[in-house]
């Protein structure tokens, strides 16, 4: 790596006199032209109230085209958005902050006015007072069509039977776009124990749409098919799920160690014997996986870099004594640059081969520009590989053993100043597999298509819907979208007078796919493949004509360590050459791509290697029939017959390195709504199509914090961000209860003599004087589990920064503070105010880090918990990043309520998954107990530095939280 490439390329932010960010400047250099530096400036404009009004990216600002324009209400809530990528949207809220009307798919006419001809309007209905204001229904209307009620919520009453099932007040019937979700019972901790799904009749017909008119549930139920798919779970006393029985009766069981981490898992097929999936899992003191052994006897070990704790090795092998013989199956070794970009990946389990005067090493190497965008990649591919497109290459069968099947390749990537991937140049000289893939990008947006569709940038926007969804995949392949922006149908082959080849999809109320139907004409008959997605189960059938040719149940193991484990159980139509109830362990790489498949005997089924942005470079298997049943590939996502990958909220085109539609979460990853993982697919991955995640838990960008707004706007009933808005309301009510208890206690203390008052107040948790110490109340939601985990009641822990009883390890720095500036003390802040670095209350130095950390541990212990190693590590990192000098206003780093909430998520044994997964599914809320009480309390400078990973801070951070720099020498 050339260090000079990155020299003098800082990220610069320019603020106006109000402290608002008006310019973001980045400097781009390419390693092939290190002396050429391109200045990339993103512009922001704010209105007179300080609310964002416009944003322009480095490319479109030269054309005087605004990427985003916003119109806000008096409180700063965005009510109207103009986007060159995603079209225009209108959102109106009620006085409670709930969405009432949302209008999408608004295009801009040639006259500059909004074109509502294809607009979609959604209206939301809620309970009236004195009921708690829960959602009742959602109405959807496409302009010119009749309105349909697409969602309906039915809540349990208060009968003895409902109480016995813990259903009182719960949403027990949710009618959505796919049918009905019925909750039959709930645990004491609030986790659903029995959930049933019923589908609409004739759901395979994409013209059949849900419409839950009226209030007659019997009329609604008449629209449903008779089949019921019920999932049953069992939990322990703390609410952790122990067993899950899927819709056909297969049972998954898990066990946890004393720290609450997964230690083993088992599967019992319906009518069968229990079998081991994960035999044992061991972890480091920091909670990182060290070793896992599967039920097939295959062992995976993990190696981490001591200084950074980055994952540098994943070794999968059959150990000595294995029935199939000892063998290293995969041995991935990672090398990084200082900031965590992957420089090389080597598979030491593979041999170096020689063919046509070239040395073919099982290694991939990568180079980046100064913005950490991938600009070149080299590796090996199958010698017969052709130009990458939407089709998979033919697999090598059987698994190769000679040197004539692999050759070296190099790929280079070219981007414009807005981050659009413009060109992929592929070179494999030994096989003359040289080609260039060009992407044509609009001159007035970031919309882009393969040049095979058009080479004229002026024609690109016409190939997209008003809301930014691509209308054509390849020449002759039309894309049809639902009013909600979900891909409904892909026309693969249009035949005119005879039936077409197509693939269609149906979604639930959270826009998650529940059904896929593929139709193909063969020999004058139609072959229809159907995949129904249920919790822990994929039900796949194939019919030829009127007869059912195959009935396959794919059991998806929810807890299987790093591997994805799938069991293939045929009810009928099992093909020859594959056993029934075959268990397939799929071992992933750093970005979750499925590289190695192994069966229950520890024998290799298939191996696959990928180009950086997707696409298959190497694919080999022991038999052709087994390759047909590999559906999960790049990034651990399902690949459809279209060649697209389904991520959850969007579809991805691996041959173009672009998303098929604009980001539904908005600008969470910048102004370009089609860019894939910031053009760094080796370091970043996208779990659901909304925002990239750094699985190395490296620094996050400020842009990622905009996801808070998107999460609230989505207001999911189900899905990865489910229940966040409702939890915010719950958190607000909990804070209100603390304040009310304080008032009640003060009323009791009123009139009592001072001596008696002090004695009486000792037994009270909340009084006015104690609230000044607590200052803040925090809560946290985690949605990683099938049943979300919520906890509040976190309060600031005491830690003195006074001259008396100074916190251990702290040395006070006596700055002179003007009396008038005391208004900025947290206890006296009113509405959320901007952090003013030059107006702080002084600084303190952590002179003895170990004494400081010991003091924090002691405070956590006194509150009834232990400081987790991950949180302690973040506190230490925060100290190091600030040269051990911190602002007094921010208090003792690590003692605030929101950091305790973070500590709870990491430590809670009821939450499964690794640290990255736990944090990604966590939402932290903090509210004031002093000053402007019961209002959002932005995370202070210290908390923002500590809560700096994948977790979502839903109540904001102080402005400039990462830019406070002390320029004075102490």
From Swiss-Prot:
InterPro entries: Rhs_assc_core, T6SS_VgrG/RHS, TcC-like_repeat, YwqJ_deaminase. Its main location: secreted. The keyword Secreted applies. RHS repeats lie at residues 168-182, 297-311, 329-343, 361-375, 408-422, 500-514, 580-594, 606-620, 640-654. This is Toxin subunit YenC2. One of its GO terms (cellular component) is extracellular region. The lineage of its organism: Bacteria, Pseudomonadati, Pseudomonadota, Gammaproteobacteria, Enterobacterales. The record marks 690-691 as: Cleavage. Signal peptide: none annotated. Residues 849-950 are annotated as: Deaminase domain. It comes from the Bacteria. Residues 610-690 form a beta-strand plug which closes one end of the shell; the other end of the shell is closed by the 5-bladed beta-propeller domain in YenB. Disruption phenotype: A double yenC1-yenC2 deletion is no longer pathogenic in C.zealandica larvae. The keyword Metal-binding does not apply. Keywords: Autocatalytic cleavage, Repeat, Secreted, Virulence. It is found in: Secreted. Semipurified toxin complex consists of at least YenA1-YenA2-YenB-YenC1-YenC2-Chi1-Chi2. YenB and the N-terminus of YenC2 form a large hollow shell of beta-strands. The shell is closed at both ends, within which the C-terminus of YenC2 is probably found. The C-terminal region dissociates from the YenB-YenC2 complex at pH 4.5 but not 7.5. The Yen-TC:K9 subcomplex is about 26 nm tall and 22 nm in diameter with 5-fold symmetry and 5 copies of YenA1, YenA2, Chi1 and Chi2; the chitinase subunits may be solvent accessible on the exterior the complex. PANTHER family: PROTEIN RHSA-RELATED, PTHR32305.
């Amino acid at each position: 790596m050339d260090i000079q490439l990155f020299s003098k390329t800082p990220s610069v932010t320019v603020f106006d006199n109000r402290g608002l960010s008006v310019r973001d400047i980045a400097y781009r250099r390419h390693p092939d032209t290190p002396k050429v530096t391109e200045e990339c400036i993103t512009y922001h404009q704010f209105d007179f109230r300080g609310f964002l009004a416009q944003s322009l990216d480095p490319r479109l600002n030269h054309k005087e085209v605004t990427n985003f324009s916003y119109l806000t209400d008096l409180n700063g809530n965005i009510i109207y958005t103009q986007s060159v990528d995603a079209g225009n949207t209108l959102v109106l809220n009620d006085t409670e902050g709930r969405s009432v009307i949302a209008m999408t798919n608004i295009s801009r006419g040639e006259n500059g006015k909004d074109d509502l001809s294809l607009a979609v309007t959604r209206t939301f209905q809620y309970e009236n007072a004195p009921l708690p204001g829960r959602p009742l229904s959602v109405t959807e209307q496409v302009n010119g069509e009749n309105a349909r009620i697409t969602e309906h919520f039915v809540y349990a009453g208060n009968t003895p039977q409902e109480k016995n099932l813990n259903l009182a007040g719960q949403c027990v019937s949710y009618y959505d776009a796919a049918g009905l979700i019925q909750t039959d019972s709930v645990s004491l901790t609030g986790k659903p124990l029995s959930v049933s799904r019923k589908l609409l009749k004739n759901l395979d017909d994409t013209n059949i749409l849900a419409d839950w008119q009226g209030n007659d549930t019997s009329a609604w139920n008449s629209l449903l098919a008779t089949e019921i798919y019920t999932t049953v779970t069992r939990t322990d006393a703390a609410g952790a799920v122990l067993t899950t029985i899927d819709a056909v009766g297969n049972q998954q069981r898990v066990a946890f160690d004393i720290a609450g981490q997964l230690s083993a898992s088992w599967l019992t097929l319906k009518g069968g014997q229990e079998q081991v999936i994960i035999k044992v899992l061991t972890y480091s003191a920091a909670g990182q996986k060290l070793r896992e052994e599967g039920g097939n006897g295959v062992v995976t070990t993990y190696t981490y870099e001591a200084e950074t704790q980055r994952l540098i090795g994943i070794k999968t092998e059959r150990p000595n004594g294995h029935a199939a013989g000892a063998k290293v199956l995969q041995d991935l070794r990672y090398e990084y640059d200082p900031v965590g970009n992957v420089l090389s990946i080597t598979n030491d389990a593979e041999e170096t081969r020689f063919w046509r005067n070239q040395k073919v090493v099982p290694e991939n190497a990568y180079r980046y520009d100064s913005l950490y965008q991938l600009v070149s990649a080299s590796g090996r591919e199958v010698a017969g590989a052709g130009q990458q497109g939407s089709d998979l290459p033919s697999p090598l069968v059987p698994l190769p053993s000679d040197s004539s099947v692999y050759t070296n390749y190099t790929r280079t990537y070219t981007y414009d100043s807005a981050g659009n991937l413009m060109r992929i140049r592929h070179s494999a000289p030994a096989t003359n597999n040289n080609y260039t893939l060009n992407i044509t990008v609009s001159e007035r947006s970031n919309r882009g298509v393969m040049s095979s569709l058009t080479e004229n940038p002026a024609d690109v926007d016409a190939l997209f819907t008003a809301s930014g969804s691509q209308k054509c995949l390849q020449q002759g392949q039309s894309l049809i979208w639902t009013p909600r922006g979900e891909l409904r149908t892909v026309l693969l082959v249009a035949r005119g007078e005879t039936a077409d080849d197509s693939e269609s999809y149906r979604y639930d109320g959270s826009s998650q796919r529940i059904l896929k139907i593929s139709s193909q004409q063969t020999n004058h008959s139609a072959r229809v493949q159907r995949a129904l997605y249920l919790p822990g189960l994929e039900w796949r059938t194939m019919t030829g004509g009127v007869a059912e040719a195959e009935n396959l149940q794919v059991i998806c193991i929810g807890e299987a360590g790093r591997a994805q484990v799938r069991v293939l159980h045929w009810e009928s139509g099992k093909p020859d050459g594959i056993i029934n109830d075959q268990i397939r362990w799929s071992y992933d790489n750093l970005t979750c791509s499925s590289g190695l498949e192994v069966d229950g005997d520890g024998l290799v089924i298939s191996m696959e290697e990928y180009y950086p942005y997707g696409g298959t470079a190497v694919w080999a298997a022991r038999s052709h029939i087994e390759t047909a049943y590999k559906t999960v590939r790049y990034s651990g996502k399902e690949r459809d017959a279209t060649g697209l990958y389904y991520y959850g909220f969007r579809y991805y085109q691996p041959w173009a390195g672009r998303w098929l539609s604009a980001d539904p979460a908005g600008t969470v990853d910048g102004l370009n709504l089609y860019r894939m993982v910031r053009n760094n697919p080796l370091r970043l991955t996208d779990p659901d199509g909304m925002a990239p995640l750094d699985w190395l838990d490296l620094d996050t960008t400020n842009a990622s914090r905009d996801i808070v707004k998107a999460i609230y706007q989505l207001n999911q009933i189900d899905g990865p961000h489910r229940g966040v808005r409702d939890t915010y309301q719950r958190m607000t009510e909990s804070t209100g209860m603390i304040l009310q208890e304080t008032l009640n206690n003060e009323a009791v203390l009123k009139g009592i003599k001072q001596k008696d008052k002090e004695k009486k107040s000792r037994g009270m948790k909340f009084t006015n004087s104690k609230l000044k110490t607590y200052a803040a109340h925090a809560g946290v939601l985690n949605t990683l589990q099938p049943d979300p985990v919520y906890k509040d009641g976190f309060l600031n822990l005491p830690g003195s920064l006074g001259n008396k009883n100074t916190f251990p390890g702290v040395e006070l720095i006596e700055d002179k503070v003007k009396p008038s500036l005391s208004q900025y003390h947290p206890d006296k802040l009113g509405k959320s105010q901007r952090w003013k670095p030059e107006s702080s209350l002084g600084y303190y130095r952590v002179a003895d880090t170990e004494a400081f950390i010991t003091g924090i541990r002691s405070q956590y212990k006194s509150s009834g918990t232990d400081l987790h190693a991950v949180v302690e590590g973040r506190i230490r990192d925060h100290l190091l990043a600030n040269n051990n000098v911190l602002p007094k206003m921010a208090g003792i780093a690590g003692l605030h309520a929101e950091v305790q909430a973070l500590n709870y998520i990491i430590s809670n044994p009821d939450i499964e998954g690794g640290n990255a997964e736990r944090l990604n599914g966590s939402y932290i809320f903090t509210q004031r107990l002093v000053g402007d009480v019961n209002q959002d309390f932005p995370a202070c400078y210290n908390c923002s530095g500590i809560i700096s990973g994948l977790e979502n801070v839903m109540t904001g951070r102080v402005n400039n939280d990462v830019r406070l720099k002390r320029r004075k020498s102490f």
